[in-house]
Structure formats: C-alpha cells, structure tokens
C-alpha cells in the first residue's frame, strides 16, 4: 500500500532524510549551501544530463566550456543585469597576497562571460543562428535558508544554452524550440509542469521577457525548474555583437537563453516519492532492476546460481541491473532499495528455481507479480512503460488538483490557508495591482499562462484590487 502522509505533511524533513539516506548528497561540507555529490546521486544526475545532451545534439547546439571567473569590467557592461545580480555574487579580490587590479566575479550565470567572445566569433549572417550550451558550476550568495538541490550557493550542474539570431522572429522560434526540448525532457522524467510568462518586475535581469516552468511540490509550494529568456538586442548592444546582413549593412544580433539545474532532480525526488523514499523513473535510475535472492537453508547455491543467470540475461538485454549478495536479511535489502527508488525488484527463492519463475515487485505501486522465467525480459520492459505512464499520470493529477481559479483575494487566501498550490486570479495588468496582490496573499506572482492565448481573462471579470476590467489571468503561489 503506497502511503504519502509524511511525504506531504512533513515534506521538509522527509526530503532532507531521503537526500542523505539514499546517498544523493552530503551536506556536511564546511561551506554552507555547498554540497558534495555522492556516487548514486551523481549517477542519476548524469542520466538526466544524458537526455539534455541528446536534445542539444538533435537541435544543433554545440557544447562549449567557459572559465568560471569574469572580470568586473565585463560583468558591469549590462546595467540591468548587474543590478539584478550584484547583491549575490562572490568576488575574488586577491591573487596570493596581492590585491587584483580588476576584481573578478565567480560566475552567477554566463552571459557576461560569453558575450565578449560572441562579439569576436559572430561576423556575418552566415554565422547565424549561433547556438551553444554548457553544464557548469555557478555561484550565488543565497541569503535565504539553503536547502540541498533547491536553494544552494554553488549550483554545480547548471545547464545554460545561449543563442544568437538575425532577427526577433528567429529568436522567438528558438524559444519555441526550447519549450519543445523542455517538454521532451519532462516526458523522460515523467513530470507535469506549467509555463508562465513572468511579470515585468520579476523577469531575468536584462531580458525583454522571461518564461518560467514550475512544478508543485508535496507541501504545495512551487519550484522553478526551467527558464527561457528572450533578450532582444539588450545584451548584443552592451557587448557589441554585430553581424553583417546580406545587403552589407550591420545589425545587432537577437539573443535567447535557456537554463535548468539540479532542481530537476529535486523535482523528480519530491514529486514521485512516497513515505518509503524515492521512486525513480526507469529512464534515469542508475539501477533499473535489483535482484534479491531469498534462499532457504541448504538451497543457497542453486538460488544464487539462478539469480546470477537472471542478472546476465537482463544485462545482455541492455537493462541496468544489480545482484544484491550483501550479507543482510532480505527485509533490510527491500527497505534499502525502496528508499533508493529502484523501479523493479526481482525476488527469487527455492520455489522459483523449481518452477522456473521469478517474482517482480514494482516500486511505484508496491505490487508484486509472478512471471515465467522465459517472459522475464519482456515483462520487465513492459513494467518500465507502465511505471512511466503511472508516474506521469499521478504527477499530472497532483498538479491539476493544485491549480485553483478564483475571483477574489478572500478566496485566494482561503486556498493558501487550506493547501497551497497555484491560485489563478483575474488581473488588470498594472504592476501596482500585481504587487498589491503579492503583498495581500503573501505569495509570489508566477506570471500569466503561456502561450498568451491561454492568459486572457474571461469577459466581465474584474481585477480584485482596482475593480477595473481584467485583461489577464495571473498565477500566484508560495515558492521555493
């Protein structure tokens, strides 16, 4: 029986325990907000990144790797950007005993590192569109309560794609492609999400507009797990990124970025988990099938040999498998692998050896079936598909049941008191009314639904602050 009581009621404690006990990260490193990746956690993250690399390859992005240090002179070129980040950067002021002539910034994100180089690389319309990406460590001095994978001072698996285009239309096409890449990745992770266009006061520093992707966590707060930004020519003018057009004239490029991080793993752990621990999608599980032999006295040899044969068969079929021969009781092993979220467990005992059968236990529903040995590989593959489908449907149901449309601030407050989630409310579009609603609801405006056709307020609806005709539906949530 799947229980999710602790998972939702004591999410914070549950999450910290799972991260630690399942071997994802060790947060005891002596710098607050900087954590050590442990082998199991890093393997899961690398499996997620494998899909990111595949999508980048498919869409013609080239991988690059930039230095982590940015000269203050470059960092300060785009005024809005520096204003947005200055309060949370780490400065390098000395080399040995000597103060540096030009201070260096540990990158909080890489626009200011990359764009002086883009100005050297991009020359003509033939160089466009120009599409690169990297996965690197970035540093932000978070003053809020730090939390592993969610709010950290060293984001160590930061994915950022940067593109340059001849015109605004092509940059818009890129944003659509980013959304498609993101959706493909979410399918691989069995996650359901929403996309919102951020309000003017909360867009990325230096952007023309920003889109954010959110999931709803077990405690009803939202977690931003992806962002896409259209910069128009804001950065290319600051960094002088010009290209020669076909008619021989010059113009500034249009730019976009797309970012994700280890918050993807935080979302997977949180949204699919239950009171026993993680439930990993088979797509990214380092171990997709674990075999636990359960011998009776005197049958050890035949049970172990049978289990070994199963391990070889699954491995030959391209399935990531592990045979658990540790000197521990089966019950202890079940507990351990359930905590680690292994999608399928194979149990074999003397009766299975006699009948040429195996018992398959699925982690998502905690159900068991007995199958014939010769059907094993097909059944396991079938289970993987079933698990992916079930996880996605459950995640989608969770998301949809936590989005509530209301008309007044009173109704919105009641939703937040009751169970949090996302509240959609009519809004006139004025910043002052949006900020007033944030204050009244003690929540953040995520923005308006995207694409914008979905964002129009129903006819006759009124902004709850000023009483004027509402133009948009605005989304509010308590966020991480």
Curated annotation (Swiss-Prot):
<dbReference type="InterPro" id="IPR033721">
    <property type="entry name" value="ProRS_core_arch_euk"/>
</dbReference>
<dbReference type="InterPro" id="IPR004154">
    <property type="entry name" value="Anticodon-bd"/>
</dbReference>
<dbReference type="InterPro" id="IPR016061">
    <property type="entry name" value="Pro-tRNA_ligase_II_C"/>
</dbReference>
<dbReference type="InterPro" id="IPR036621">
    <property type="entry name" value="Anticodon-bd_dom_sf"/>
</dbReference>
<dbReference type="InterPro" id="IPR017449">
    <property type="entry name" value="Pro-tRNA_synth_II"/>
</dbReference>
<protein>
    <recommendedName>
        <fullName>Proline--tRNA ligase</fullName>
        <ecNumber>6.1.1.15</ecNumber>
    </recommendedName>
</protein>
<dbReference type="Pfam" id="PF00587">
    <property type="entry name" value="tRNA-synt_2b"/>
</dbReference>
<dbReference type="GO" id="GO:0006433">
    <property type="term" value="P:prolyl-tRNA aminoacylation"/>
</dbReference>
<dbReference type="InterPro" id="IPR002314">
    <property type="entry name" value="aa-tRNA-synt_IIb"/>
</dbReference>
<dbReference type="Pfam" id="PF03129">
    <property type="entry name" value="HGTP_anticodon"/>
</dbReference>
<keyword id="KW-0547">Nucleotide-binding</keyword>
<comment type="subunit">
    <text>Homodimer.</text>
</comment>
<keyword id="KW-0030">Aminoacyl-tRNA synthetase</keyword>
<keyword id="KW-0963">Cytoplasm</keyword>
<dbReference type="GO" id="GO:0005524">
    <property type="term" value="F:ATP binding"/>
</dbReference>
<comment type="function">
    <text>Catalyzes the attachment of proline to tRNA(Pro) in a two-step reaction: proline is first activated by ATP to form Pro-AMP and then transferred to the acceptor end of tRNA(Pro).</text>
</comment>
<dbReference type="InterPro" id="IPR002316">
    <property type="entry name" value="Pro-tRNA-ligase_IIa"/>
</dbReference>
<dbReference type="GO" id="GO:0005737">
    <property type="term" value="C:cytoplasm"/>
</dbReference>
<dbReference type="Pfam" id="PF09180">
    <property type="entry name" value="ProRS-C_1"/>
</dbReference>
<keyword id="KW-0067">ATP-binding</keyword>
<dbReference type="InterPro" id="IPR045864">
    <property type="entry name" value="aa-tRNA-synth_II/BPL/LPL"/>
</dbReference>
<dbReference type="GO" id="GO:0004827">
    <property type="term" value="F:proline-tRNA ligase activity"/>
</dbReference>
<dbReference type="InterPro" id="IPR006195">
    <property type="entry name" value="aa-tRNA-synth_II"/>
</dbReference>
<keyword id="KW-0648">Protein biosynthesis</keyword>
<dbReference type="InterPro" id="IPR004499">
    <property type="entry name" value="Pro-tRNA-ligase_IIa_arc-type"/>
</dbReference>
<dbReference type="GO" id="GO:0017101">
    <property type="term" value="C:aminoacyl-tRNA synthetase multienzyme complex"/>
</dbReference>
<keyword id="KW-0436">Ligase</keyword>
<comment type="similarity">
    <text>Belongs to the class-II aminoacyl-tRNA synthetase family. ProS type 3 subfamily.</text>
</comment>
């Amino acid at each position: 029986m799947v229980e999710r009581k602790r998972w939702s009621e004591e999410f914070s404690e549950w999450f910290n325990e799972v991260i630690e006990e399942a071997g994802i990260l060790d947060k005891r490193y002596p710098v607050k907000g900087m954590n050590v990746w442990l082998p199991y956690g890093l393997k899961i993250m690398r499996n997620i990144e494998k899909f990111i690399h595949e999508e980048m390859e498919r869409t013609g992005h080239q991988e690059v790797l930039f230095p982590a240090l940015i000269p203050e002179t470059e960092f300060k070129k785009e005024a809005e950007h520096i204003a947005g980040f200055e309060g949370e950067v780490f400065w390098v002021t000395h080399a040995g005993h000597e103060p540096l002539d030009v201070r260096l910034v540990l990158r909080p994100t890489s626009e200011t590192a990359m764009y002086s180089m883009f100005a050297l690389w991009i020359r003509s319309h033939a160089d466009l569109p120009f599409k690169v990406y990297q996965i690197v460590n970035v540093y932000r001095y978070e003053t809020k309560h730090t939390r592993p994978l969610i709010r950290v001072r060293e984001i160590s698996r930061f994915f950022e794609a940067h593109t340059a285009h001849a015109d605004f239309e092509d940059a818009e096409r890129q944003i659509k492609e980013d959304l498609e890449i993101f959706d493909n990745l979410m399918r691989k992770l069995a996650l359901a999400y929403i996309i919102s266009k951020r309000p003017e006061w909360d867009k990325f520093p230096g952007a023309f507009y920003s889109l954010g992707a959110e999931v709803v966590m077990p405690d009803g707060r939202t977690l931003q797990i992806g962002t896409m930004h259209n910069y128009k020519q804001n950065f290319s003018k600051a960094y002088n990124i010009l290209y020669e057009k076909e008619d021989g004239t010059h113009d500034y490029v249009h730019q976009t970025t797309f970012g994700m991080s280890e918050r993807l793993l935080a979302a997977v752990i949180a949204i699919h988990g239950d009171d026993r621990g993680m439930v990993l999608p088979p797509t990214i599980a380092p171990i997709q099938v674990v075999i636990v032999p359960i011998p009776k006295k005197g049958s050890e040899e035949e049970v172990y040999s049978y289990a070994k044969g199963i391990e070889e068969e699954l491995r030959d079929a391209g399935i990531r498998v592990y045979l658990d021969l540790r000197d521990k009781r089966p019950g202890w092993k079940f507990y351990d692998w359930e905590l680690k979220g292994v999608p399928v467990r194979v149990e074999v005992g003397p009766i299975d050896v006699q009948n040429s059968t195996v018992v398959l236990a699925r982690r998502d529903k905690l159900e068991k079936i007995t199958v014939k040995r010769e059907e094993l590989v097909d059944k396991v593959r079938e289970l993987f598909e079933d698990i992916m489908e079930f996880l996605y449907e459950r995640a989608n149901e969770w998301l949809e049941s936590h989005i509530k449309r209301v008309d007044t601030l009173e109704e919105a407050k009641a939703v937040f008191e009751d169970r949090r989630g996302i509240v959609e409310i009519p809004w006139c579009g004025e910043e002052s009314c949006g900020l007033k609603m944030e204050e009244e609801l003690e929540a953040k405006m995520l923005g308006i639904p995207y694409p914008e056709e979905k964002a129009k307020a129903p006819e006759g609806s009124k902004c709850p602050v000023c009483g004027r005709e509402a133009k948009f539906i605005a989304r509010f949530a308590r966020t991480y």
